[in-house]
C-alpha cells in the first residue's frame, strides 16, 4: 500500500512537472508558439528581407532582394484558430499578419486575409487594424513607435481582430477557408516578440 502511495505521488509530481514544462514552452492550453523571442522558428521565406533575432525579437528592416515584400510563411495550415501576437513597428512600417492563405508560394491580400499594420497607408480605412478589402477601420489606430498586441480569431466565416485591447474587426466573410499564415515585412522597422496560435 505504501509503495503504491509513493508511486501515485511520483506520477502526480511527474504530471505536474510536464504540465509546467508545457506551459513554459508556450505549448500549454493548446497554444503553439511560432515566435518566442529567442529563435526564428520554422518558416518558409517568400521574398527576401534581413530577418534576424535581435534583443529578444524577430526583426526586419530592409528588403534584400528585389522590391517585393518578404513573408515568413508557416509550414502548417490552419482553419479555425486564435492568434496572439506582440510586435513593435516604427512609423514607416508596412507589415501585417496574413491568414488562411490559399497557397504558400505567393502571398498577397487577394489570396489571404491581410490583418494590416500600416499607419501610413494612403487609404487609412484599410490601414492598421483592418482586414484589407474585407473590413475597414474608422478611425485607424496607430501602431508606430510602441509595442502592440493583436488577438485574431477565425472561426468559420467569423473573423475578429482586437488591436491593443480594442476590437477593430468583427465581420463575416467566407472567401478563404483555411491555409498557412504569414508574417510580412514591406518597409520600415518591424519587430515580432511573440506569435502564438491555438487551433479551435
Residue ranges: model-predicted function:
Residues 1-11, 17-18:
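Bacterial N-terminal signal peptides that target proteins for export
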Residues 22-200:
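Carbohydrate-interacting regions of secretory-pathway proteins
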